[in-house]
């Protein structure tokens, strides 16, 4: 199976969990809107290519890792498009999540996609140490001091240390590329 098919299947499976009984239907729809139709899927493609080059021994884990990276990327786009940041009315040629579903649901959608990224990785059977390492890499790419959250927070500062902000962007890319 080719990389694009693997990525799309992993994302469809992950986002499909939002259709579980009890999940608010508007949240599920907003999550689908954020993830599909697809963008370039650069991050998961790189993930799959690196795993293949390193002798991939757990395709399910590779697919989950790629999906997790894409879910985090989509979450960052949902949050970044909101009026409190970039106020972007469109994303990928259609209304951004906040324009289509409102600000409160957009905020929850971004948060739900972050949680879903971790859940997607956690569901794959693998060695505990390997899973812990992957979860740490993913959490570093999202959190503090250099992840997506830190990068977004730098945009809220009245004075920006450009060198530190640049380092933050590099760490975010490095963590995602591990």
Regions of interest found by a model, annotated:
Residues 171-178:
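Conserved small/polar residues in nucleotide/adenosyl-binding loops
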Residues 126-167:
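Histidine/acidic-rich helix-loop-helix segments that form or flank divalent-metal centers
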Residues 87-112, 159-170:
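Divalent-cation-assisted or electrostatically stabilized phosphate/pyrophosphate-binding catalytic cores
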Residues 24, 62, 102, 106, ...:
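Membrane-interface starts of transmembrane alpha-helices
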Residues 46, 117, 151:
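Residue-level signal for inorganic ion chemistry
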């Amino acid at each position: 199976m080719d990389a694009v098919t693997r990525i799309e299947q992993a994302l469809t499976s992950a986002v499909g969990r939002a259709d579980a009984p009890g999940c608010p239907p508007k949240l599920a729809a907003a999550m689908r809107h954020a993830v599909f139709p697809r963008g370039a899927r650069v991050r998961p493609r790189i993930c799959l290519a690196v795993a293949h080059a390193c002798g991939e021994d757990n395709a399910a884990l590779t697919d989950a890792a790629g999906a997790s990276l894409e879910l985090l990327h989509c979450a960052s786009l949902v949050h970044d498009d909101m009026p409190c940041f970039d106020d972007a009315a469109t994303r990928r040629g259609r209304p951004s999540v906040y324009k289509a579903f409102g600000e409160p649901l957009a905020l929850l959608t971004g948060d739900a996609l972050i949680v879903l990224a971790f859940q997607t990785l956690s569901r794959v059977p693998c060695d505990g140490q390997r899973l812990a390492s992957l979860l740490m890499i993913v959490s570093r790419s999202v959190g503090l001091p250099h992840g997506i959250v830190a990068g977004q927070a730098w945009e809220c500062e009245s004075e920006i240390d450009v060198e530190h902000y640049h380092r933050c962007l590099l760490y975010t890319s490095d963590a995602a590329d591990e």
